[in-house]
A protein has these predicted regions:
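Short helix/turn-capping signatures at newly exposed starts of structured segments
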Residues: 1-141
Length: 141
């Protein structure tokens, strides 16, 4: 899924590359895959329906620079199924399990010991108590 050499991330229905433009990204997927699209003066934030990669589902949030409309970073997180995560079913215990699953998946996928730093960017597994979520942050340089 993650190519360590060039930073390409492949899901079953589309692939992302460092510095992909917003226009190019939108041409890759159907509009019904977008759950939300928010903009502010700094970034364009797009949240997708969970996407499949092999036998796993990932929630995906992408951030594009408002200045040049280029992908700057994304957050992905393993999901148990294709349903959209909600606060009604949220628990800290579940989020800590997601963090553990994200860590395990990264170790299998990348194989190195964190921190994961590459010429194209860096990858970090995060549990944020303030945000109430666990995710894999991929930041492109």
């Amino acid at each position: 899924m993650i190519n360590k050499l060039d930073g390409k991330i492949a899901f079953d229905s589309f692939s992302l590359t460092p510095n992909i433009t917003l226009q190019a990204f939108k041409s890759l997927l159907k509009s019904n895959q977008i759950v939300s699209h928010e903009e502010n003066e700094m970034a364009i934030n797009i949240y997708l329906l969970p996407q499949k990669c092999g036998d796993k589902y990932f929630s995906i949030r992408l951030y594009f620079s408002q200045k040049n409309k280029v992908l700057t970073h994304l957050l992905i997180s393993l999901q148990k199924n294709a349903s959209i995560p909600s606060w009604t079913s949220w628990s800290e215990k579940d989020q800590l399990e997601v963090k553990k699953a994200n860590d395990s998946w990264l170790s299998e996928e990348i194989g190195d010991i964190p921190p994961y730093k590459f010429s194209w960017g860096e990858i970090t597994s995060v549990y944020s108590q303030r945000e109430g979520s666990s995710y894999i942050a991929i930041k492109y340089y």
